[in-house]
Amino acid sequence: MLRHLVCCFVGPAFLILSACQEYDFKVNDKIVYTPTPLFRDYAIPDTGLNDCVKQAINDGTVTTAPQLMSLDCSFAGIEGLEGLSIFTGLKALRLSANQVRNLVELSKITTLEAVYLDDNKIIDPVPLYGLAGLRDLDLSGNPNLQCPKPGSLTQVASTVLPQHCR
């Protein structure tokens, strides 16, 4: 009888609770579980980038800045990257087909391993030179890019440059 009670009531209760991870849970009017709030302590002026980061935080239930490890903001109309460096855990960043020009903010995210900046308006790749962990880099489709000097991206295993830099 006890086994039947456990199977019929306790098991489904735990199943329901696991689906309610975003809500306070009360027993006898006492809160027994409060979820950690999502990370919101950042300021990103670019609307496209801000919306993309907000969505990534919601999708990944990110509660601290370093927890955001991957971000895909392709085709988002992004022009500026200011404020992105608060996400110190970023390893993969995809910003394909935007209007990005300045990469200084990326130089502060030393955890980056893969950066896709194809089809933007980048001119100066120098801020990427100091990213020691960078392994994959795509700068194709940036017609005004100042071609990286030989040896400046030796740490990068895979580099895709615009046609005029090949």
Where are these regions (language model features)?
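A residue-level signal for beta-strand positions that form part of recognition/binding surfaces
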Residues: 14, 41, 70
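Residue-level signal for mature regions of secreted extracellular proteins and peptides
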Residues: 13, 45, 158-159
